[in-house]
From Swiss-Prot:
Residue span of region Disordered: 156-184
Lineage: Bacteria, Pseudomonadati, Pseudomonadota, Alphaproteobacteria, Rickettsiales
Pfam families found in the cross-reference section: Ribosomal_L9_C, Ribosomal_L9_N
Entry's Gene Ontology molecular function annotations: rRNA binding; structural constituent of ribosome
SUPFAM superfamilies on file: L9 N-domain-like, Ribosomal protein L9 C-domain
Protein name per Swiss-Prot or TrEMBL: Large ribosomal subunit protein bL9
Amino acid sequence: MLIILKENITTLGKLGEVVKVKPGYARNFLFPQKKAMKATKENLIKLEEQRLLLEEENTKKLNAAKVLASSLHDKFIILIKQASEDGKIFGSVTTREIAKTLLQEGYDISHHSLSLGGISIKNLGEYQVNIELHSKVIVPITIYVVRSEKDAHELRQAKLQNQKSEQQEAEQDASKEAADADDS
């Protein structure tokens, strides 16, 4: 099926391009998400008329994604899962579960935007997850899968302590640089 892209999609192409995709992908994902439309003569003419508007809308989405990306910088999520003695969790962690946790923390991100990088999270530990906020904005976040609330609390405290010490080091470095600049 030939479609016209209404926004940049990393795996398909850029805004306004006519691409061929499987009908189910278009019908079940691209059309409902308003990321594409059927490639007809009428739609091609309509697209040319609306190209500036769509590009402006895409720029707004990009800017919003950059703002959200800055708030997600150095973000980590702690998930508590039941696990066996050797660290294998019962079930697995899914993108839906991660999206639900992000929503609870105030970030409305679709599970379609999350990428586990081809791995399945079936053990306790630390994992890197990428969030595609826009085709040009991909933000990595860290997921920690722990066994208990106590482990989660200890991990949270350790992360906060690390962030405080890094911030203090950065402030000290900045003050040293300022002092060195004053001496020059």
